[in-house]
Structures are given as C-alpha cells and as structure tokens.
Amino acid sequence: MEAAGSNPVFRSTWRRGGVATQRSAKPCTPVRFRSSPPITMIAITGSGEFLPSILDVDRKLLNYLDDIPHVLTLSTAAGKESDARLSYWENLAIDHFKNLNVRHTHIDARNREDLNQDYVLEEMKQSNFVFFSGGSPNHLYDSIYDSDFSTELHHLEKRGIIAGCSAGAMILGEKMIKGVGLNYLPNTIVIPHYGESFYSWISNTVKVLNRGKYKLLCLEKDTYFVKDADQLSVLGKQNVHIIYKKEHHTFSDGDRIDVSLLQ
C-alpha cells in the first residue's frame, strides 16, 4: 500500500534479531527453518491476515521455507481504496512480521504499473514468501496477469511460498466468483470468509456456483489451505471445505486432502 508523501514505495525491512529501520524490535523467539527438498507452495486463507489470531499459524507456515524468510507483502487488491485504508494494511503487515522476527518488505504497489516497476521485480527476485492481502480480487487480477510481475510470481512459486487472504486467495483459482483467476489451482473457485456471519451472502453464492463445473474451495478464518507440490493439507485453527455438487468435505488442522477432490 502507499505511504504518505511523495515516495511511491514504502519499504520496512526487518532482520532476524532487529529492525532495519529507526524503530527497535522487541526480542522474540526466532522461527526455525526446516531442511528438506525445495518447496513449491501455495497457502491461502479465508480471512484474518496480519491479525494476532493468525500469528502462531503464520509462524508454522514460515517454518516450511527451506531458507531464512524474506517476506514481501502487497496490498494491491486495496489499490483503489483510501489512503487511510492502505495505511491500515501497511501498518498491520509491518507489526505482524516484526512480531514474527523475520525480514519483511512492504511494497506500495496500487496497480499494474506499480507492480511492474523495476524495484518491485527486484524485490520479488530477492523474496521467498509473497503475501497478497484483501480488497478487490478483480483489481488484483488485472494488476498481475500477463506481466513481468506475473513471470516473477511463477519463479517465486518454485523456490518459496505464494500466500494470500480473501481477494489475495481468490485470484489463485482458475475462476473467481466474478471473472477468471491466475489458475494456480486449476478447476477451482476459491471462496473466502466461509461461515462468517458478516458475509452471509456467501452461502447463497456457493449454492449458485455449485451448479457449475468448478470445485469450490471454501476457506474459513485463520486457516490455510496448503498446496505443496502435489500434496494438499490444512494448517490453522478452523476448517477448509471442498464442495462439489452433492459432496461436501470438511478438513481441519493437520488433515491431508486427496488431490483428486480438486481435479
């Protein structure tokens, strides 16, 4: 999201054990990183990005990385919203990853032109974890598809984690509620905010979409659907649902998902 002032990018870079800005970081337990074959991971959740309730879940997610995390957050989905709203996402992301004690860069990229600037593409090359927060899924898709940024996103998937919440999750399906997605999850429509009373309209939307050919991947708050190569699983506090016609499968933390359910 965009910071106040003339600078088109606001970047706060966190180091393990300290903050690379003028503010000091509070000591916290470092994330431990696994030693394993390279991952190609997608992790998406229905809601709750950067909030205290998902902190421990994100700590576990970061543990999947093969190397020390370099997290990049982008609130491009909210690019058409107010400066105040963009500042909200910016500050929330900064505080969240500061508490996780990992290196973090927040890029202010509000649209397609912003995303495809050289400094953004270079940040993508240096990162191994990119997170797209909420807003308009269609604006986010229009900002990414068929671009140099999209190419870098595919490269990042081969060495790290593409993560998203709400609109940032929806774009990774083959199709969205309205429009098409980036097709990281073929044959799938991602439905965020599943089961939340504030989004009661989603229940009717699911009924309508379930008449079509796509599998519905319904995500609850603070819970990731994780795709690691050909392995599917759940990480978090609530549930993930796969709905197709008369079938409704529910999964919770630690569950493995048969890949055929999304084929």
Regions found by a protein language model. Name each.
Residues 41-67, 77, 83, 87, ...:
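C-terminal and late-domain segments of enzyme folds
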